[in-house]
Every structure is written in structure tokens, then in C-alpha cells.
Amino acid sequence: MIKNPYRYSPWLTVVLRISLVLLLFSVSRVFFYIQNRDIFGPLSATEWFWVLVGGLRFDVVAVLYINLLYILFTLLPPGRHAGATRVFDVLFVVTNAIGLLLNCIDSAYYAFNLKRIAWGSLGELKGFNNATELLSSFLVRYWYVWAAWLLFIGALVLIVRYVRSTRQKYNAHTYVDVFLLTFILCMFGFRGNLRYSTRPLGLNDAGKYVRSPQNVALVFSTPFSIFRTIGEARLEKYSYFSDEKELEALYNPVQQSEGEGPFRKMNVVVLVLESFSEEASSVSNTNTTTNRFMPFVDSLRKKSFYTEYSFANGKKSIEALPSIWGSIPSYTQPYVLSEYSSNKIYSLPLILRDKGYHTSFFHGAPNGSMGFQSFANLMGIDHYYGKDEFGDNSQFDGIWGIWDQPFLAYYSKTLKTFPQPFFSTIFTVSSHDPFKVPKEVENKYPSGPHPIFKAFSYTDDGLRKFFESIKHEPWFQNTIFVISADHTSPKCDLPEFRNSVGVFRIPVFFYVPGMDLAGKSDRVFQQTDIMPTVLQIMQYDQPYVSFGKNLLSPKTKDFAVNKYENYQYIYGDFLLKLDAGNKGVGLYRYKTDKLLEKNLLETEPDTAQLLERNFKAYIQQFQNRMIDDRFTVK
């Protein structure tokens, strides 16, 4: 029992407690920044001031949502009784502890996702069959997150013990007045402003408080992100262009391979490499501290059709396969989890299956993990091989799946049994947090600035052995090998790989040993380009819908699209950053201005206008077709 708690009127007690919770949210914002300072970079005192001021505005909304029941019940007459007060104290601690827990978890998770957790992100948890192992690993590796959360809980307990209300009696009129006033203030608080002529405070409003668009996640909290994105999974149609001919002239997703000739029944093997970042490659990174960890992939890349500037379309594993197989870019939420996931997509596996191909997908994770098995079936994959089919739990890494080297050996052995022609994809797992390699080979591979670099080398060596084992197969020369990472690593050492361009730079290349295709291109590659480029190599002669480009055609625009909080549009040498309303807010020559320090928006307005116009045509085609289920050619 506290002998001298501070006692106030019930209304003032609520105000003081909420104010102290707002202070804790600001502290959690600082903690969030500290854990991700390599991503956000240094902030000046002025920048911090506006982040905290803007953050307070967003936190008021989130904290009012979190404490709505506590506020209303406390101010009702039953809330004056001692028993009810204890119940509401517990409610106050528990609900605010959950809100602060979300902020703490996101301080670690943000590096993987590059955006705050949203309502749609929570659905991704259903796809993990190994949730227990993942949670155990998270508890151990990110112990400081839980330590910070326990400190926040301690602060909440101190608040309810020291800031208490008197048991005052009021007449019915006073109760009604206080309750109505509180309710009205809460309604305005939920909106984030006092004007009904404006929209409620949204995620895009955070841009007012930062200089760099990539720092908006510092302003709003994770609870705010979740509350504001509930029910917002639906896309909205755009009408930037009312003239269909004008729209199609700027961007037409209905594509067809160029040239004439019979369809080439070549085998297709797609290798999706977990978290392989351009930073670990010597092809475009000259820093020897980080560029020496995928020697085989680099050597194979130089024998392939490749570029120094290739990009992921998203930042999650679950976003990679729709981009690679279906030429679908990343958008508000992962396509696999969206309401549009049942849309008709004439994907690369489906096209080839209709041509008589054997189709397969290999993923060493527990069967069904991340919803890949179901999605693969929708995309035309007839044969799925996961941890269950591998059948040897002694090779399980304890968290994500079968170690890459034995699973790649299993892939090679199984691939040799398939009838030709075949389409097959493998998705590696070992270079995933916590970036472990088998103990027996720990000393075989070099260490880097972060454990993921050793994991890169381990998987890279597994890929070398895989290609050694199949290079004498009779079908090898008649096979198109596509190598792409799913996304970049959450841990980057060099500043140029931590900005909004670098965090999407991955290897994407085409190795075709039986054709004279090898060479370095000066074009921009992205994952959505894989499908149209493979179909061009095979001389597929039917129209299809793709939101990438045929890299072998000089007629296609040289662009890439990805989402970093908001969309960004890469076009040749330029990067255009867009706000939530798809208006350009930053223009950079990203190839020479590697840290994106010189905004050319005002000095090159014509270029900015051109890129914005191209992007708006692209996004209008994409979203309107997604809503109308028009991803196939009738």
C-alpha cells in the first residue's frame, strides 16, 4: 500500500494518466529510432523537435483508442467504487502495455519490413506453421526489446499506484456533463483534428513533420498504423487519365513477345535466394568488407544477362513470388493475403503448364508456411516439395526449415527425375534471421560485419554444388536459369545500401547456357520483368498481362517500381519519390548521387513531371485492373 499517493479529481486523474502514457509513447519512439538509426540516419535537433511534436499528435489518436474503455468507464458513476477502480487500473495497465509492446516489437521488425506493422500485416502471422520456434528465437535474439517492454510496464504500474483519484460524489447533472464533454473530446481526438472540413489524421500526414519521406515511420506509432489501416485493404480506382488511348500510350500491361519463330520448349529453373543483397556482391559493390560473400553467384552472374541495377519490388518474402511468377508489383498489402488473391492471373507457371510443362515448387520450410503452398497451387504449380517431402528432420535448422545445402542437393536429385519440359522454382531459407549455419561448417565460411554474410557464403556454396551436380545433365543446355533474391537483407553495412534505393537492390539475372545471351546490360531490372523476359526468350506468341517489361526489347520503358512507405518510381538514371497521393516529392540521380542527398525536383521539373505522369499511368492500370479482375487477356 502506498502511504501517500497523489489524489486528484477523477477527470484530472484520467488526464494526468493519459499524459504520462503519451510521454511513454515518446520514449518508445526514441527507442524505435535507436534500434533503426542506421536506416533513418542522423537527425538534427530541429528534425527531432518536429518528429516529437508530430509524434505527439499521432500518439494522442492512438492512446485515446487504446484507453477508450478505461476513460469512459472511469468517468461513469460505477467507476467510483473501490472494486471498480482496481479493475480499471488493471485495464489501464494491460491495454497500454499492449500498445507499448507493439512499438517495442516494431523496433526490431521494422528493419525487415521498412514500414510500421499495419492491420494487414497481422494476417501474415497465420501463415507461419513454426510460430513457436520463431517466438523462441525472437525472445532470445531480441532480449532488449522485452527488457524495454518490462520497463514500460513498470512505469505503468507506478502511474496507477501514484496517480489516483478521490472518491468524490457528484450529482447526476455533473456526471452527464463530464461524460458528454469527455466523449466529444475523444471524438475529436480520434480524428486528430478539430475540423470536420478535413479528413481524419492519416499515415500520409506524417510527411509534414519530416524532411525525408523515409523517416515518416518515426512520426506515427505502430498502434496508430494498425488502427488507421483496419478495413483499408481495398484498393481505390484511379482516374488520372480518362482517355483509354492516352493511358495505353503511356503504359499498356498487355504485352506480347517480339519476333517470329516456333515456341522454344526450354526448361525453366527459378532460384529465389533469401535476403541476398547487392551489398554482398562484387558485381556492383567495390567495398571489400562486404562484397566477398557470394563468389559463385557473382561468377555465374558475369556469364549471364545481367545489370548492376536490379531491384526487388517489395520487402517481404511473401511479396516475391507474385512478382516473379505473376509479374505483380507490391502494393498496400501482400497480394497473397489480399482479397484479390483469387483474381485470375495467367502466371508464368500457368502459361507453361498449358504448354505441357511439369511444374514444381521447392521450399524447405514446414509445409504450408507463409501460404506458399496454396498460392503455388493457384499459380499453376502441380507439385510442391517442402520439409515433409524432404523427410529428414536431422537437417532442420530449428526455426525456418531444412538447411540450404542438403535441400539444394535434394532439389538436384529430384529435378533429374522430372519429365521435360519442366518449370521449377526453389526458395532458399538459411539466410533468414537468425542467420545460422550448421555447426559443422561454421569455420568454413568467412565472417562479415553481420552474421548474415556468413549465411550468404553458406548458401552460395550450396548453389555452386547444385550447378556442379546438374551441368552434365542432357537438359542443362536447354534450360533458362533465373536467379533472383526475394528482397534485401535487413542488415546493411554501407550507407548507400540503407537508403530507399539500396534497400531494394538485389541480384536478378538470366543464365542461359545454351544461348548467346550473356552480357552486361545498362537497363534497370526488377522482379516483375522476369516473366515477360522469359517468355521472350521462349518466343511465346500469345498476348498476356504483365506489370514488368521485356528486358530484351529496346521498345520498353526502362523503369522499376517499389514501395518504401510510399511508392517510388525508377526511370533510367532517375528516382522519383512519391507521397501518399502519388505526387512527386523528391527527384534524384541515384546512380551518381548514391546517398540521395541532392533533390532535383525544382531544378529538373520537366523530368519530375514526366516520371510522375508515367507512374500515374502505371498505377492506374495496375489498381483498376486488380479491382476489376482484368489480369488476363480475353
Description of each model-found segment:
Residues 2-220:
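Transmembrane and membrane-interface helices of multi-pass
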Residues 36, 141-146, 411, 441, ...:
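Residue-level recognition of alpha-helix termini/interfacial anchor residues
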Residues 37, 67, 282-283, 494, ...:
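Short, function-defining helix-loop hinge/capping sites that tune catalysis or transport
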Residues 54, 100-103, 224-229, 617-620:
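Short, hydrophobic/amphipathic alpha-helical patches that form generic packing surfaces
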Residues 195-545, 553-565:
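Soluble catalytic regions of membrane-associated enzymes that act on cell-envelope
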Residues 201, 514-634:
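Membrane-interface soluble catalytic domains
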